[in-house]
């Protein structure tokens, strides 16, 4: 085998030997001539034609989504910034100073219990130029003529945003002094949190990775609103700021294919490529910018790289033989970090010194001049040009890969250092160096006090600051807390078909009840169009396929094929104005769409009512971080956990059977959760949710678990509506037994409440015990009510004690209390403190891993069926001294309970 053959056989990683350099030169010269005379677009077309011809000729063409390690926009193609860059530079300097001062001041506190408040200086320092360009020239606030651009701001840069708002007069010095000190109501939150600063921050972007994911679905939802004629969103943009290290979060890149597929040209990602994450380099041995370029371009995005500032323009223009470009590509990110952590002499030797030709290029430059060769993200003009190109691009989402230095301007204390992310304490000399670097007019005598700096209102800088925001409609970030519009929710009687008993011999599930409720709501002329059904490829599972034809599935491209089931009544209909959001097998996407719709009252001044239904096990457990973010964003809407209950979804097994989603739901303070048993409970609860979230615009969202088990529905008992909402009502009176017969109270929720009905019959027939059965649609709401009463009593010891709703209901009864649910024991255990004093309380639940089998077998395995309820009731009576313990043993034997079987918790 020849050397050349061996090299070619090694694959695409090898470069074949140039056997005819003159021919190669002629081809390259021809391409250069086309570029010079006819432009880059024509050259691109010709190259594509040649590649296609090669493929058609069966030549294996290796694909690369990468371009050279240079700026995408040529200097000659840069749009000139119309602003006053000198004034903008001074304003940025003041913001840098105030952001630094805020963090350093916060960490000078030394409370007796110790501890630092934290904060970050380095991140904002690296992208101040980008925020300057956006705030001064691109980002519109909501106004009469514009719905407002949406900004997902990188969490760690919050001090810089506060520093800007301080100059604008939106935040006071007292608030800056209380950075990360929020308890007394004067402080500023650590990161963007709408819950904590409801009129300021719109979107929480920490945990990292959630911002990019949510933003993609937010941009898609803007298109959805426009396509359905609900709001004009065509001139609005979604800008997303992320860190290059953040892109390793799987959520960051997980939905970029959707953005390209749906042509979300209203979406712009700005990835701050300072090459560092918290501990060290993002890709020390590689090039994160090239990696991300390949990811995004390969997914169909428009990619703009901004790597080098204007100081490099002349050097690149003189780089006729490509030596400089070659070194730029060869240096890895670890090298680039080292260059900025050292000095100009180091850069001369270790960067330019790699090739005699590049070393000669800079022989006329001093070490300081070499050091001041900036990266693209620190060049205001080039940032403006890149932003303008991104803002005007049509047909694709755009990503800006902007190279910066983490800790820019922090000097030896942090610039380019691995420790910069944690740097929050600066000494006086470091502060002086920072001041001098950015020409802040603060004398040495005040350095120790580290004052904030704000020019007088009549200075050119302050006038310019306000003029630019006035031209763009107002100040950002800003959050709307209520929509201007209002709706009246249809009366509860509208949902009569769900409230009434099922006809004799007819059985339905609570999932079917939900679908009936939703279908009726969709018919409401006012509110119906605002309903947003969200699916993750489970419509047929939940019996919702009838909605496909009725309201259509949203697809911006319509339906360009004939569906295989077109001849059927419920065919799969995609439509440009479709109402259903079908996310495929994608719970994170479904939740992100739900969040976009659930916060539309704030982001779009349009009240929307999202209903997202999914396998309950794949809800809070799978996307818990997004659910927490939804709480932070004050989301309003319905989450429906279908096929719920550890023993009710009988055949699916361990990963599908949910026994703890309500425990997780209760960790979110503004999540109101219910586990209804009956259709009428579903209707009453959902109607209450509509009243609270739509009519009264309360900042809550609802979680309901739904069942796939069919049974007869008893219908609403008039007068129990409020009790259902509170979480507990007597649904079946105890049978009339002789006076003095033992009494017990059976509590339950979901389908296991029906086991209590059967247990009631067994207790009467086999043991002469009178059992009352209570439906408890929400042990979580009962718990919150009880805890609220407890708290009030703790803080008002001299006033009459408040009584919890649980105690109020059970105080009128006698006998032990047995609660059984299809969830872990912890769910019903929560109300134990509120059970009347002296009463025995037993809890049955489904602790342990799920498994596949029939429902009856699973309920026996988890010890929650009617027989275990009877045994628990008798045990409670025995502990109360009402029946002998032998009765319990007798029941165990009668019902064939295996006392030696393994505890289901460990099975």
Give residue spans per PLM region.
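N-terminal amphipathic, basic-rich helices that act as targeting or association modules
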Residues: 2-168, 434, 508-524, 528, ...
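Thiamine diphosphate
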Residues: 3-5, 184-204, 210, 224-235, ...
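Glycine- and acidic
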Residues: 12-13, 30-33, 80-88, 107-119, ...
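Non-catalytic terminal/interface segments that mediate subunit docking, oligomerization
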Residues: 81-99, 103, 110, 124, ...
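Cofactor-binding active-site loop characterized by glycine-rich and histidine/acidic residues
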Residues: 82-95, 99-114, 120-262, 285-286, ...
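Short alpha-helical segments and helix-capping/turn motifs at coil-helix boundaries
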Residues: 113-117, 129-138, 144-148, 199-203, ...
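Residue-level marker for buried hydrophobic side chains located in beta-strands
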Residues: 240-241, 269, 534, 640, ...
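A structural-propensity feature for long, helix-poor, extended segments
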Residues: 240-241, 247, 625-646, 651
């Amino acid at each position: 085998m020849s050397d050349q053959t061996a090299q070619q056989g090694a694959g695409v990683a090898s470069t074949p030997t140039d056997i005819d350099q003159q021919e190669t030169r002629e081809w390259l010269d021809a391409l250069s001539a086309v570029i010079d005379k006819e432009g880059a677009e024509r050259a691109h077309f010709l190259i594509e034609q040649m590649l296609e011809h090669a493929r058609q000729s069966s030549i294996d063409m290796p694909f690369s989504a990468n371009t050279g390690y240079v700026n995408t926009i040529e200097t000659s193609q840069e749009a000139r910034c119309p602003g006053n860059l000198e004034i903008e530079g001074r304003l940025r300097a003041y913001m840098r100073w105030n952001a630094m001062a805020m963090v350093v001041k916060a960490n000078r506190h030394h409370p007796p219990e110790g501890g630092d408040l934290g904060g970050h200086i380095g991140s904002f320092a690296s992208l101040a130029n980008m925020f300057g360009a956006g705030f001064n020239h691109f980002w519109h606030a909501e106004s009469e003529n514009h719905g407002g651009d949406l900004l997902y701001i990188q969490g760690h840069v919050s001090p810089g945003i506060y520093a800007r708002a301080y100059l604008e007069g939106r935040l006071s010095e007292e608030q800056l002094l209380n950075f990360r000190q929020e308890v007394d109501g004067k402080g500023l939150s650590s990161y963007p949190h709408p819950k904590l600063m409801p009129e300021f921050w719109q979107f929480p972007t920490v945990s990292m990775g959630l911002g990019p994911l949510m933003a993609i679905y937010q941009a898609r939802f803007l298109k959805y609103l426009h396509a359905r004629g609900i709001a004009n969103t065509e001139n609005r943009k979604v800008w997303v700021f992320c860190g290059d290290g953040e892109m390793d979060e799987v959520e960051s890149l997980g939905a970029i294919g959707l953005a390209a597929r749906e042509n979300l040209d209203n979406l712009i990602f700005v990835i701050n490529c300072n090459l560092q994450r918290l501990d060290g380099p993002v890709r020390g041995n590689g090039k994160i910018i090239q990696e991300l370029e390949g990811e995004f371009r390969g997914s169909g995005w428009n990619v703009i790289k901004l790597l080098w500032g204007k100081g490099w323009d002349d050097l690149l223009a003189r780089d006729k033989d490509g030596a400089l470009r070659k070194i730029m590509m060869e240096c890895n990110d670890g090298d680039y970090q080292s260059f900025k952590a050292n000095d100009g002499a180091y850069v001369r030797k270790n960067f330019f010194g790699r090739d005699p030709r590049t070393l000669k290029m800079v022989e006329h430059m001093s070490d300081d001049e070499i050091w001041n060769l900036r990266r693209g993200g620190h060049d205001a003009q080039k940032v403006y040009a890149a932003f303008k190109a991104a803002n005007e691009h049509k047909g694709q989402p755009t990503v800006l890969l902007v190279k910066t230095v983490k800790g820019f301007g922090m000097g030896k204390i942090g610039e380019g250092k691995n420790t910069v992310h944690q740097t929050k304490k600066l000494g006086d000399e470091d502060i002086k160096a920072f001041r001098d670097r950015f020409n802040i007019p603060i004398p040495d005598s005040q350095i120790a006090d580290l004052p904030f700096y704000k020019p007088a209102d009549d200075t050119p800088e302050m006038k310019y600051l306000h003029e630019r925001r006035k031209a763009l409609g107002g100040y950002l970030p800003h959050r709307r807390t209520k929509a201007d519009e209002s709706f009246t929710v249809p009366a509860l009687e509208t949902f009569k078909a769900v409230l009434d008993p099922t006809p004799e011999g007819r059985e339905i599930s609570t999932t079917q009840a939900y679908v009936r409720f939703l279908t009726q709501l969709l018919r409401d002329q006012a509110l119906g169009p605002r309903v947003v059904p969200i699916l993750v490829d489970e419509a047929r599972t939940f019996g919702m396929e009838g909605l496909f034809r009725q309201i259509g599935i949203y697809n911006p491209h319509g339906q360009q094929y004939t569906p295989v089931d077109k001849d059927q009544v419920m065919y799969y209909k995609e439509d440009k104005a479709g109402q259903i959001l079908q996310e495929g097998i994608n719970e994170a996407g479904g939740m992100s769409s739900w969040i976009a719709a659930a916060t539309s009252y704030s982001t779009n001044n349009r009240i929307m009512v999202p209903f997202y239904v999914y396998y309950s096990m794949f809800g809070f457990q799978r996307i818990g971080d997004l659910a927490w973010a939804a709480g932070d964003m004050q989301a309003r809407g319905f989450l429906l956990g279908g096929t719920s209950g550890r023993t009710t979804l009988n055949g699916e097994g361990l990963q599908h059977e949910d026994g703890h989603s309500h425990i997780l739901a209760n960790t979110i303070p503004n999540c109101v959760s219910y586990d209804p048993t009956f259709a009428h409970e579903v209707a009453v609860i959902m109607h209450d949710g509509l009243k609270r979230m739509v009519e009264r615009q309360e900042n809550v969202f609802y979680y309901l678990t739904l069942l796939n088990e069919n049974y007869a529905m008893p219908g609403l008992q008039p007068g129990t509506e409020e009790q259902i909402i509170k979480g507990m009502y007597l649904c079946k009176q105890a049978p009339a037994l002789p006076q003095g017969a033992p009494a017990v109270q059976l509590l339950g929720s979901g389908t296991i409440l029906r086991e209590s009905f059967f247990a009631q019959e067994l207790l009467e027939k086999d043991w002469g015990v009178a059992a009352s059965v209570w439906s408890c649609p929400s042990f979580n709401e009962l718990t919150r009510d009880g805890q609220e009463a407890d708290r009030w009593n703790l803080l008002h010891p001299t006033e009459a004690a408040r009584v919890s709703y649980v105690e109020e209901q059970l105080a009128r009864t006698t006998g032990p209390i047995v609660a059984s649910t299809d969830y872990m024991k912890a769910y019903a255990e929560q109300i134990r403190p509120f059970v009347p004093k002296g009463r025995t309380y037993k809890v049955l639940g489904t602790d342990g891993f799920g498994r596949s089998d029939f429902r009856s077998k699973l309920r026996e395995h988890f010890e929650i069926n009617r027989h275990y309820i009877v045994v628990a009731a008798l045990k409670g009576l025995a502990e109360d001294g009402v029946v002998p313990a032998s009765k319990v043993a007798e029941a165990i034997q009668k019902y064939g309970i295996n006392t030696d079987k393994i505890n289901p918790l460990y099975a």
